[in-house]
Amino acid sequence: SVKKEEEVLTGNLQTLKIRVHEGYEEFTMVGRRATAILRKATRRLIQLIVSGRDEQSIAEAIIVAMVFSQEDCMIKAVRGDLNFVNRANQRLNPMHQLLRHFQKDAKVLFQNWGIEPIDNVMGMVGILPDMTPSTEMSLRGVRVSKMGVDEYSSTERVIVSIDRFLRVRDQRGNVLLSPEEVSETQGTEKLTITYSSSMMWEINGPESVLVNTYQWIIRNWETVKIQWSQDPTMLYNKMEFEPFQSLVPKAARGQYSGFVRTLFQQMRDVLGTFDTVQIIKLLPFAAAPPEQSRMQFSSLTVNVRGSGMRILVRGNSPVFNYNKATKRLTVLGKDAGALTEDPDEGTAGVESAVLRGFLILGKEDRRYGPALSINELINLAKGEKANVLIGQGDVVLVMKRKRDSS
């Protein structure tokens, strides 16, 4: 479709520059709990047929479609200023701004959208602005299908791939969509994929953010671990931890972060307290700007499933459960992956075989002499420390364990 820039005014008289998609298009949106077919013209939603597991999933799909329609009544439904930023303090693009705004509160959007009388069609019902079903009236252009949406789709499904810059390509390599030109959501909602970009985790709601964040840490544990011990600030600023912040109660973010960072610093300083599972569990909380306070916590709250659930600082909970026997992590009952190492040891992967029996204490410390190769470690006595070269030229300080690990 052709795209051209247009300036539009929100309900708060803020000017937004959006790239308008001109012409008729049809999209299949596939989320985790809802699917939909959207037919739209230039800045106009023609028809949306949505099917989902529950009221909230249906509402989320409707919001995405309404925002993507770029209709004026959606833009005029904005109350207050749009100033969502990512953690690097860059403003999100206008379409994303709108999406975030209405994901927080869509009441005005639904109220202003307009309703229409509907015909009685088998398997279809209307949906009112308060998200209750109706057989007489429905939000303009919107219908809920009880059976799923496949049979209403006239488009062929295409197999696409997404690269890490969120460019969507077909099998011939043509770019169909990219963030440069469209709200990220639309480009991905229509695809059944696990999002490779953390910007996408939020679209499927809080649970998806939680699971994806921990999956990401586990998948990248090798590099995360080295950064954790050598350059934690860089690690805390990673954009992958950004979506997670929306789950942490606003008032607690800074306190949690300060608490976790202090705890981590103690782990780096105090011998023998490196605890892989605990680091993985608490790491996302350290990403918020920390507040210095003497607050101690035994559990941290995250808002998922409509209420606060607790992650225990020490030990398992329904939100975060590590099974020592299987070495697998489950987050909210979903498998988030396996830890390839014995969490008792401070290391994994290539070095784990050789560094079994050693603790990684943190950054290189020149007082303990030049860096040894892994093979030279054999000569250390129990409790003795040394710098050792691991991985890609990284030097860390290790200590030979005083006890033999079981």
Curated annotation (Swiss-Prot):
Annotated compartments: Virion; Host nucleus; Host mitochondrion
Cellular compartments per GO CC: host cell mitochondrion; host cell nucleus; virion component
Domain of life the protein comes from: Viruses
Subunit structure: Influenza RNA polymerase is composed of three subunits: PB1, PB2 and PA. Interacts (via N-terminus) with PB1 (via C-terminus). Interacts with nucleoprotein NP (via N-terminus). Interacts (via N-terminus) with host MAVS (via N-terminus); this interaction inhibits host innate immune response.
BP GO terms, sorted: 7-methylguanosine mRNA capping; cap snatching; DNA-templated transcription; symbiont-mediated suppression of host cytoplasmic pattern recognition receptor signaling pathway via inhibition of MAVS activity; symbiont-mediated suppression of host gene expression; symbiont-mediated suppression of host mRNA transcription via inhibition of RNA polymerase II activity
Similarity comment: Belongs to the influenza viruses PB2 family.
The protein's name in its UniProt record: Polymerase basic protein 2
Species name: Influenza A virus (strain A/Chicken/Hong Kong/YU562/2001 H5N1 genotype B)
Keywords: Cap snatching, Eukaryotic host gene expression shutoff by virus, Eukaryotic host transcription shutoff by virus, Host gene expression shutoff by virus, Host mitochondrion, Host nucleus, Host-virus interaction, Inhibition of host innate immune response by virus, Inhibition of host MAVS by virus, Inhibition of host RLR pathway by virus, Inhibition of host RNA polymerase II by virus, mRNA capping, mRNA processing, Viral immunoevasion, Viral transcription, Virion
Function as written in the Swiss-Prot or TrEMBL entry: Plays an essential role in transcription initiation and cap-stealing mechanism, in which cellular capped pre-mRNAs are used to generate primers for viral transcription. Binds the cap of the target pre-RNA which is subsequently cleaved after 10-13 nucleotides by PA. Plays a role in the initiation of the viral genome replication and modulates the activity of the ribonucleoprotein (RNP) complex. In addition, participates in the inhibition of type I interferon induction through interaction with the host mitochondrial antiviral signaling protein MAVS.
GO molecular function annotation: RNA binding
